[in-house]
Structures are given as structure tokens and as C-alpha cells.
Amino acid sequence: MKVCIIGASGFVGGELLRILLQHSGVEVVCATSRRFKGEYVYRVHPNLRGFTQLKFVEPSIDAALKADVVFLALPHGESVKWVPKLYESGVAVFDLSADFRLKDPNAYVEWYKWPQPHPYPDLLQKAVYGQPELHRSELVGAKLVAVPGCMATASILMLAPLAKHGLLGETPPVIDAKIGSSGAGAEGSVVDLHSFRTYVVRPYEPVHHRHIAEIEQELSLLAGKRVKVAFTPHAVDMVRGIFATGHVFVEKMPTEADMWKMYRSMYGDSKFIRIVKDRLGISRYPNVKYVLGSNFVDIGFELDQRLNRLVTFSAIDNLVRGAAGQAVQAFNVAMGFPEDEGLRYIPLAPV
């Protein structure tokens, strides 16, 4: 199956290349970049030296149409210019931007500051939210997939079993997320320079972060009612990784056995979700160190009987499970490949 990556010079584009170059069912036929047009891919992504002789080409519809599948690793607001033409042509599209994640066209005005509602509401409804654990049946054969956001992924998956079992009540769950510097992309702002980022722990967009929209959308679907969340992310001194902590206040506390049953019933057959709650060993709860470079989501929980509070944890690699890895996982499900094809990475340790 021939694949083209539009926007292949950034961190996410590089991860797509790393994964797809080792996928047994894929031939990467084009990787685009305006800035690096004509340059060897490995000169921008040195870790790929020896694995490919591809050169970057100018992004164009014509280049994309040489492939069966197109991965769009473009900034928010850019994919919407590409998707209609690609979709009409019959090419399968996996969009890693936010441009087709939200079902409500008006949500793009509120959360992404678009000047008007989404111009393609029909395509919004056709797009499948690309989280295989929650939308597996819809993904099979899908031609337009909206790959979830990184912090949304960590947040949704740790709270999904609680939403499904009616434990998200009137009090909004509180989500505290930490993310590494690669989340800012390959061309971040001045505060992402080493001298500013080293040793940092700082909040950003502490209220009304745009990932709230998809977190609430997905949890509401599972709960069968409107769910709101309080979400605050923090930039921290690491390159890769997201760690999220969720606080859910309930009227009636489940037992620990109930919690295990809820999480196992939803994720027991998942190839990429590991429940980490151990009384022994050096990692008794999820830890970003033990998912780096992989597509795993490590999820844990604890019960606070004093406050009727459920504490949930999740750890992911933001570039893999939070972006490129999840895109390939969704691609595998959509196209009939083994779900873990190209994604069989044991996380590095120590790092």
C-alpha cells in the first residue's frame, strides 16, 4: 500500500516516517516539505539515516494522489484545505490536525478561534475519531480519520471506563496534565528554547485549552449525557511524554475490585493499554519513562476514601501514542492489518 506524508519534516512527520518505514504492508512513496524540498529526509531526521533514500518534495495534491493513503501532519487550520479534494479522489486520509475531530461545526469558532463555523460539516460527520479502543467498528474501512490530540488521548482513555459506568457526576472531573517540549513542535516559540525550557514546570492555557472540546465530546458519548471537565496542562522539563492525573469526585465509592473490573472490561483485550497498579516493583503507578518510544498507554488509579475521590493516572509518549503511533494504529484497523503492525516497540529503559 502506497503512503504519502504531507508535512513530514516536523517531529510528528518524523515519527510517522520512523514507524511506516518499518511497516510490512506499506511503501512510503512521498514525504513533503516546502522548507526542505529536494533534501534527503535523513538530513532532517538523522535517526532515519540508512533506512531511506527519500527526498522531500513540494507538497501538492498531485504528489499526494500517487499514494493510496495520505497522512496529513499539518498545522491546525491547514488540513481543511486538503481533505475535501483528497477525500473526493478516493484516497484514504488520516489527519493528525484538529480540523476534523469535533462534530459540532460551531465548536471551531469557540475552541480554535476560526472566524466562521467549519466549512465542511458533512465531512465532519463522516470523519471517524481515530481512537481504536473506543471507535474500532467505525474505523474498519474508514476513508477519513481524525487522529485525536495528544493530551486528549491521555485524558480520555484514563477516564473512559468511569464515564461508561456512570461515575462522572455533576462535579466536573479535574485533569492535570504535564507535557514535554516536543509537544510544541519542531518550530516552537522562544519559551521553548533550552535556556527557557530547562528546569521548567509552568502552566499554559490553564483554562479553555482547546483539547477540552474533544475530551468532553468523547466522554459525553460514553456517558450518554453532557460531561464537562476542568483541564489544565503544564510544560515540564522533558522532551517526550505526557502524564495526566484525573480527580473524579463521586457520591458512592466503588471498591478496588470494581475499578479493576471496569478497566479490564474496557481494555482487557487491548494491545496497547497496560493497567499499572502494583504493590511491588519499582513502578507501582504509570510512569512516562516506561512508555517512551512506544504506542502504549499506561493507566493506573487509586481510591481516596476520605474524600470520595477516584484518582486516575495515564502516561503516553506524545509523539507516538499521542500522534503518529495512534495514526498508524487507526490505519491498521481501517485497512485490515494487524493492529500492532509497525508498532511493536518495547519502550527503552533506562532513558
From Swiss-Prot:
The active site is at residue 150. Keywords: Amino-acid biosynthesis, Arginine biosynthesis, Cytoplasm, Lysine biosynthesis, NADP, Oxidoreductase. Pathway: Amino-acid biosynthesis; L-lysine biosynthesis via AAA pathway; L-lysine from L-alpha-aminoadipate (Thermus route): step 3/5; Amino-acid biosynthesis; L-arginine biosynthesis. One of its GO terms (molecular function) is N-acetyl-gamma-glutamyl-phosphate reductase activity. SMART domains: Semialdhyde_dh (SM00859). It is an enzyme of class 1 (oxidoreductase). One of its GO terms (cellular component) is cytoplasm. Its EC number is 1.2.1.103, 1.2.1.106. Belongs to the NAGSA dehydrogenase family. Type 1 subfamily. LysY sub-subfamily. This is Putative [LysW]-L-2-aminoadipate/[LysW]-L-glutamate phosphate reductase. The gene is lysY.
